[in-house]
Amino acid sequence: MTAQDRSSILEGYYKSHWPVECGGNRRQKATEGSLNAREKKAVVQSIRNERWNVMTIYRDNNEIFLGGTMPSFTGPEPFGWLQKIEPESLEILAETPKLPCGDHVWCGAIAAHQNGNIIKVNGNYMHSISKECEAVSYTHLTLPTS
């Protein structure tokens, strides 16, 4: 039987219930607990920012990060970005400067690393970003592939 990622802390990731895309490398898309929505009223909150909003992760309680890139494959040089957002209003609490992604446009990925930083892969760059959305370091990936 396949083990459930939600029942243990994922090695290498920040101690969070959703530190990486799909909840873990095996993409089980499940977490402990429930929505407790039976007696609640559904509320839908959305934003429109003309960006390719790819995914959100949780780092710590109520610390939600949204990552993405620009949707254009032609025109201005593309860039990636990471935002720390408020869970209820979706207000931007912090945002990285434009993060280079090279000529290879790919939606990318984000993960909360066990050291507390957010790792963002975008195009052919990998960035380490603080919880305040400050770029700490980056690596240029030599192969322009996803």
Predicted regions: what is each one?
Residues 59-61, 112-115:
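Residue-level detector of Asp-centered blade-edge/turn motifs that repeat once per structural unit
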Residues 52-54, 80-81, 91-114:
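Blade-loop segments of beta-propeller domains
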